[in-house]
Amino acid sequence: MTDSREYTYLYRHNKKINQVEMIYYFGVIIIVTKLILSYSEIISISPLFNNLLNLTFVFLMFLKVLCTFNLRIKKVHIIFALFVIMTVYTSIQIDNYIILFTALGIIALKGMNVKSIIRISYYVKIFWLTLHFFAFIFAIFCFPNSVQYSLIDNEVRYRIFLSQPNTCAMLFLWLIFEYMYLNYEKLSFSKFLISSLFFGVIIYLTKSKTSIIVYVLLWLLIWQNKRKCIKKLIGFFSKYGYIILSAFFAFVTVNYNNLSFSRILNTFLTGRLAGAAKTYSTNGFTLLGQYLELGKKIEWDPIYRVNSIWLENSYSMMFLNFGIVYAILIAIALWYASDYLTHKDKIFVCAMLIYGISESYIVNIFLCFPLLIVASAIYNKREYLKKNYNIDEARKGECYG
């Protein structure tokens, strides 16, 4: 009789857990769909529907938090509440709600399996990106005049109906990275060839240099991770890389006109440093966010040699747009999480940090997942390895060559 009652209790308890987890998973489907459609040129969503998706996601994350946390108020609840208030303030200031969505996604992570979250995100992206890719193939053969492209430095760059070439490449790159993360222990040379063939087509169309560099570097890190020096480098860079890169780019931004190498580096990064330096000269750094008219045409500046303002370097963007406070929080999180991350996790964190040099998407945990892993590792601490990745799996990840 006792065994029967215990079984009934466990069944109901597990059913409740699954229902609570489904709230988060549904939120992931909503936000990933919203983010991709916000870039789409073939599926236009109205501002009203966009706001509805935003509010639905926020509601689901709050519901998940209410279902997970104890109703007794603790210090951690107050900290989370203040964190949300801070991100709401920043989001209103900069007119961009990604920082709020990331904060809510992190707070609601308690008890979640991060691998399952990435898997859900992966399948949603597969659906939408496949739709756009085949729509592009159909259009390019049947209605070639309807396909728009960007002409940059005499290069024709297609965007596959996704806003702009770099954004398109980013979405496909992190889709492939999600596949690699989920199938890390099964990666092989044949899988490398297949993924490279597909991504090669994307790169041929978009001409995104950043994406191909990060893609190649990630595979090199995976292949060479048996070497002790590479392991140590990955561990060090995943822990301190954000601090080092933030300090470096802040220094270059402030002293752009006084450094002999700044213009050479700016040319290599296709104008990203000059844009940040120009923004700093007119707006300065910000603690909790400031509004910038990114993309706005300005009068030609002969000193910085820019005629529009773009912030595509993640580190500069944090200081100039989102706020120094968030850069500090990310740096602390990466440092603290290092003790809980597996070697596999650290490899993908390194890829994110390198990607952030040329692109500004890394703070969005639903497009670039490494910060989601970091947050989960901190949140669940030792349970992270026990529940999501057992020790044997972690060792397999280290031995893959």
Where are these regions (language model features)?
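Long extracytoplasmic/lumenal interhelical loops at the membrane interface
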Residues: 265-322
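Transmembrane alpha-helical segments and their membrane-water interfaces
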Residues: 86-129, 330-334, 340
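Hydrophobic transmembrane alpha-helices and their immediate junctions
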Residues: 321-353, 381, 388
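A membrane-periplasm/extracellular boundary helix in multi-pass inner-membrane enzymes
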Residues: 223-265
